[in-house]
């Protein structure tokens, strides 16, 4: 299976799950045969403000590659700028979160709330894809 220029060993993909897909869990899933591991979502604004906890969430172990980093936010300019800022990190794919229904995310117009604004979705995806060379995917939620 291929996603852009990234070839996966198989089509078993670990979904990004906040509070679950930390490094030990990802390594366990890799040992069990996952072809792509997805990290917990990170906030574009937290990257912008150099949040130390967010830096820790973006740590990648060589044994887990390939890995996808999931970014969330609702400002297309900040999303694209932060995607570019972190592009040198060793993740293979950037995933945009448009599926998280948690009130503190969706309540800010981020995550699944973006599905209510197709024009903003288009702008975010377009700007992020243009900003980086790595493949970009989008996690969505069916309905809202």
Where are the language model's segments positioned?
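Flavin-dependent oxidoreductase catalytic cores
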Residues: 1-144
């Amino acid at each position: 299976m291929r996603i852009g220029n990234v070839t996966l060993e198989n089509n078993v993909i670990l979904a990004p799950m906040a509070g679950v897909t930390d490094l030990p869990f990802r390594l366990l899933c890799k040992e069990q045969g996952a072809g792509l591991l997805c990290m917990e979502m990170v906030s574009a604004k937290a990257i912008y403000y150099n949040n130390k906890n967010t830096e820790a969430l973006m740590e990648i172990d060589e044994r887990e590659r390939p890995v996808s980093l999931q970014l969330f936010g609702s400002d297309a300019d900040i999303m694209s700028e932060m995607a570019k800022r972190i592009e040198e990190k060793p993740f293979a794919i950037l995933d945009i979160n448009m599926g998280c229904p948690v009130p503190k995310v969706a309540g800010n117009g981020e995550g699944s709330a973006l599905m209510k604004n197709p024009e903003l979705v288009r702008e975010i995806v377009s700007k992020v894809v243009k900003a980086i060379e790595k493949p970009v995917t989008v996690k969505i939620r069916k309905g809202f």
